Amino acid sequence: MAKKKSKASNSARGYATTSIPSRSASSPANKNQVKGEKNNKTQKVEPKNAFKVENQSNDIGVDTVDAFDHLLLDKTLPTIDAETEVIKNTSLSNSKSFLHSWQTDIRLRKNDNVLGLTEDEIQQILKTFRDSWKSSLKESYAFSNRSSFSLRKRYLWTTFLSLKGMGFEESEIFGAFSSIPIVSIDEYITWMITENLINSEPSNSSFSYEVQPSNYTTFCRMLDEPLPANNPVQSNSRLVPLMKDFSNDIKHTPNKETQPSNQVDDSLKSKDSKPLTMSEVLTQLPEDDIPFDDPFDLTSQYVKVKLKMLRLQIANKKNSEEFSTLNLQLESITSQYLFSSKEAEIVFRKSRIEFMNKLKALQQKLENERIVEEIKKNGIQEDSQSTDDSSKDDDNNSESNDMSPHNDAETRADDDAYLMGDLFNQEEEDIQDTENDLLNANYTLLPLTTDKSGTRPSTTLQYELHKIGSNIKAEFKTMPIGKIGYQSTCFVRCSTGQKTFSDLKTVLPTATLAADYISMIVLFRLMANFTKISLQTFPKSFKEVYGKFSAEKQNTDLAEDAKISEKLDSIIKSKELETPTSATTSKLMAPMDNIGKFSGFERPPETLLNKWRQQLESESAEKFKVFRNQLPATMFRETIIDAVNNSQLLIISGDTGCGKSTQIPAFLLENSTKNGKAVKIYVTEPRRISAISLANRVSQELGGNPPSARSHELVGYSVRLDSKCTPLTPLTYVTTGTFLRLLEVGNEIESVTHLIIDEVHERSIDSDLLLIHVLHLLKQHPHLKIIIMSATLNAEKFQLYFEGSNLITIPGKTYPVHRFYLEDILSQFGNDKSFGNAAGQDVIEEDDYETDQQDASISNKSAEDAIVEMNLIPAWYNEKAINYGLIVYLLKYIFTEGDPKFSKCVLVFLPGISEILRVKSLIEDMPMFRNHRKFCIYMLHSTLSSAQQQSVFNIPPKGCRKIVLSTNIAETGVTIPDVTCVIDTGVHREMRYNSRRHLSRLTDTFVSKANAKQRSGRAGRVQEGICYHLFSKFKHDTQFLSYQTPEILRLNLQEVVLRVKMCQMGDVQDVLGKALDPPSSTNIIRALEKLHQVGALSENEKLTKLGKFLSQLPVDANLGKILVLGCFYKCVDAASSIVAMLTIGSPFRKSVDNEFSANKARLSFAKENTRSDLVLMYYAYCAWREICLSPLGPDEDSFAKEKYLNLEALSMTESLKIQLLSELKDMKLLGASDVDTCKSLKRSICRRFAVIPKEHDINSGNAEILCGVIAASLYPNILRYDYEKRQWSTLSTNKRVRILDVSVNNRSELPNMPSKFVAYTNMMSSTRASEYVNETTMVTLRQLLMMCGLKVENRVSVGQAKLDNFTVYFENVYVSASLSILRRFIETSLNEFFAEPDKRLLNSHLEVIVNIVSRLNYGTKFQKRLKD
């Protein structure tokens, strides 16, 4: 028979296999194996492109070449430098630690406080804010580029290994590294997760928040091949008997390179064949294979519909009508009340994985079947006789082993010979051809021997598999390869799948060695990551094999490390190119040229000095000398000048009218100018009206023109937003706050020669801080002369504070003033009880101020009886009230029945603008005062314009009487020259910190004795005067303080600390410890902590941009933050109204007699889902404002009476609101040229209302966004409801707190509350053990997470966000990534807004934020637990 041609054939089998690199070697002859063979045959095993194995003897192999060594030497080995090796090892260690911690955090995830988003919300967030988020990463993490190259590389390598261990693909990871700066691992996860969503591409990563599977589960997932039909996993560990397989007949021709594991050789596929696609495979999978047929189970129906939609997506039928129908079904299911999206998604994810695995397994099966069919068509078959003959010979010569399937090989060989007869002797030529084909197939014969000293690898494999899972087994299929040896295939199987391992290039001498060899491959390839195998237990030859495998693996890893190192180097270098140059950075970090730059003292030119000298000697100046010489201060001119020249500090105590504020600065200026000396004198005043009026007066007395910012006048002034002076002006009147800001600039104080601090007795925060500055200035600037002046000065205290400084006392020039007290007034009018009528009285609430210092309370009963006996005021008269009827009656009496010499000008002292407006309205209602030719009414208040304030100094025409309604502005510093009569209510309004409410409030309190004296003195400046005090002499003598309490002791220390930080005076405790009346260190520390929480101070106690705004607002820091955030979120009207009401007091009147009706009226302002007492107050304010601004409807009084509204509080609220809006405008937070107002269209206690531009007030009607702003400002004042204990407790300290029944969130409303969190304004203590709150605002998880706190630790890697000690969990990674982007955008936008208020949020961005935050996504768990 003609010799058959040798046909090249593929070395792959008809099923998926796993192969390793081929190894060629010749083996020593086995005596039993070559027994009976033809000795003249010579075998050649010659791999292509490798090496030759030649057999020079009659045995099968004699000369052996180590195939492993050739494999290692044939290629260029990769190398990495020592530094990279250290970086890799460190990164590997760090990554293992991180992954261990990450898996622990995943296991500890809780089902409480879980936050979710809809798919539409996620897409909306990503489309709107993702680009801004990426831009913010470049700015926030630019600092990472300043670290060393090796540190950045180590960080990226650690992050790479960690992300890969978490389930992300390598391509995704390096895509993130290349696209964004060097950021945290959570930011990288956010980028990768959202990148797939943006591009609508499925993610290949397996990352999720599910608990990581056990080793058994992970191992079974690796066995991803389908199990064969009717082939259950064996229950024992013995090897499976040899099975005849058609693949034994395939001629093996290896490729140039080893095929990867579990891959089918491409050479088996025809040129025209293409791999099966998923859509093609899907047609073979019946649709009825989808489970979940329960029509009453929403979760099952949800999963079934989603799987059908998945099939359509794979089949590219997403736009079909069927897909739209399924989408509608899905929406119908998810809209059901009992539907749980979280539970349904968990079930669907598991079902999707099972479905895709089944689809992949079917694809692999169909591909293998197709390949087998092609092989059969090609007719590649071998003679079965030669195969059986070789099998017979090999079986007869194999070594015995307990686990081997060949224990009785010889007997079976005889049986085969008997059964087959003479079949082996037929056609010897064909047998020879078949053997030649096998020998030319380029196999590698591995000459291993069995060493009984060690444990067989197959036994070790079964043992290790059993340790992972008892049902995991290894089965072997061993096949002879001609006469040269055996190959074995290993099937590692569990209950869900299998994995096939084989080496198609390597042949072993015996079947047992073949099974052990493939077991070594399985141990190396599959088991290395699950168990640590001791190589000492193996036979010597297999130790060497495993060592070779390890070397190969090490080289592979080394090549992979070199590849990763190269990629990381490229990425880091590209990041360095993106970093701003050092020149640019230094330019950005450089300070502004005009800040802190001192040009030194500038001496005016001689021509200007001569001009000033001529002015001081001019006729206009001489005219005022007669008046000036009559002032008591003129008598001390030389004494004062000598004292200033001879000492650095001088204290002057001058009574009212002595001329200290006008004359002493003029003395110093005149003396220096006439002597040719250039001076720069600053005079500080507590109020802007004082500074302006004094500057005008002194300029006039010195013969000059009114102050100007252009011409070089002798006198000028500088107040906030108004400056009329030049750098050469020698005498400048400034407010105390303005001078403090001048000190902040830098070395400007070097140009000042004289500093005069006036009205120091008022003890404002600014004046006390300036006194602390004086202590430093005296030491650092010896050339500086300082004068401290006051009318009611505690001289001894100030002398002690400044260590025995000089004191000059100047008597006042005043005329006698007749003082009448309340008992005198009542007795003069015959004790008319009409003055005691409650209507028209404004009761002073004692609860709003501390009485320990204000009222000298007497606790014992005998003392109280003594007070009743000594006080001459009738019992029917309420002395704790402002009696408006008495004020009007006094005015009428003064102008009609009183002495005409006291009726030229009457000054009435009132607490605030609302009282001024009320008295003005009552006066104008009287017919006698409507004649404007006979009576002129003026108002004096800080909110009025400068022109209106200056008008009070005008002298009315002859025959016209003058009435001035003023606050305590007219006490000192401002002298109205024609005042002859004073009506003193004895009350002033001041900001006072209520330690019980933990809140600062504007409070009406009685004045001090010094204040009362100053007020009465206003009537005796030009002639003999008269003063009516509307308080009793007994109250004045026994309950009034001697001096006013300093602001530093009665204000919230947060404001004091902010002012200290604003002035850059150094450590707060050191600075305040040097104050004239230092506060306690405990209160200072508490204030610092609060400011840290608000965000006004940084971690190193530096003033933040937000802190600078808060320091300029006259309210508490928390309330100031409401104003700032109100500007940011464009709800200015609501924010300013709420802050004003919290500062003034509740707009509701209390009714002891009819509490139920009052509470019902209050709740009538509530709208649907109103869960905030503060928002309820705002609704009441809006209703009152609407009544006043509408020409129709009920009048103000009847409406207020019906709704139990406090009109005085509402009027004061509107006045303070206008003032706050002016402050916001000055700080550029409110982008309006001026605060517009509109007049009331009805007769109202409030004449004008603020008008907010519409572009700044978009969201005042959105209650949810208002609640978010309130919560963000009051944080950490948050309460959480405890289900188990059924009580409210603080979020930070878990302290039990009660909510009073007056709150809209009281206990009776708990079942109706969709959230378990509330914010509170202040917490009060009671005589009971617990504490309570009464003004609360409900907060949602979204509002807490998106708007509250300074920094949220958003850990996308574990699906949680930490807000201080409070943890929120996310439903899935998409929710976590989306909310992380949204929170980052809000934080970045806020910082930009604080830095540049003109950079406001776009309305489109704000709309998305409001929609996300405002949705009531509370869930039903809270309500369910409450009902249980």
From Swiss-Prot:
It is found in: Cytoplasm. Gene3D superfamilies: 1.20.120.1080, P-loop containing nucleotide triphosphate hydrolases. GO terms for cellular component: cytosol. GO terms for molecular function: ATP binding; ATP hydrolysis activity; helicase activity; ribosomal small subunit binding; RNA binding; RNA helicase activity. SUPFAM superfamilies: P-loop containing nucleoside triphosphate hydrolases (SSF52540). Residues 641-811 form the Helicase ATP-binding domain. Keywords: ATP-binding, Cytoplasm, Helicase, Hydrolase, Nucleotide-binding. It is an enzyme of class 3 (hydrolase). Its EC number is 3.6.4.-. Residues 886-1064 form the Helicase C-terminal domain. It holds the Pfam family DEAD. InterPro entries: DEAD-box_helicase_OB_fold, DEAD/DEAH_box_helicase_dom, HA2_WH, Helicase-assoc_dom, Helicase_ATP-bd, Helicase_C-like, P-loop_NTPase. Residues 34-51 have a biased composition (Basic and acidic residues). Residues 16-33, 256-265 have a biased composition (Polar residues). It comes from the Eukaryota. Residues 1-53, 249-274, 377-413 are annotated as: Disordered. A motif (DEAH box) lies at residues 758-761. ATP binds at residues 654-661. One of its GO terms (biological process) is cytoplasmic translational initiation. This is Uncharacterized helicase C15C4.05. It comes from Schizosaccharomyces pombe (strain 972 / ATCC 24843).
